[in-house]
């Protein structure tokens, strides 16, 4: 679904919603118009995982809107119990769950390398040492640490990751980040996609954002 700038967002975030992705051409709008009110009224346990992705244009669609919203939901009456997963991970957005578990799947909200104040971690933003190591790898290590914590809190592990979406503001950083995954997974295959997106990401200075799904045996 999509909404034009200035319109009320027709977002259905009922108890069956498991995962949401906002794709926006306007980096200055962290939520569609109307969404903060809707979010504030939502019961905390019903919120799906959330990723906000900057894009240059809306793919094949041609319209004046600034935001597209993708919602993945369980069928009404599904036996899969939905619950939030809390591993003490800082989140970048208001009302953003760390992860949502439903049945044997866990949906991890898009992660960036942020501290408890919602800022990019200091190790990834030291302007005094711009060529000391890889800023992308520092971000990736922090993000994958958080993904691993969320997997453990949900009763699974990095070994059971079934889907990774990786977003870069500079696709030249793809391979350095992939090397981190290779090291963390011991060379095991990874269902992996990498996409270049326009800067900035929602957290100033961040250049890598990762969303993941995992299987819970």
Language model features by range: what are they?
Residues 1, 14-16, 23-145, 149-162, ...:
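N-terminal presequence-like segments and the immediate start of the first folded domain
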Residues 5-8, 13:
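Extreme N-terminal basic, low-complexity initiation segments
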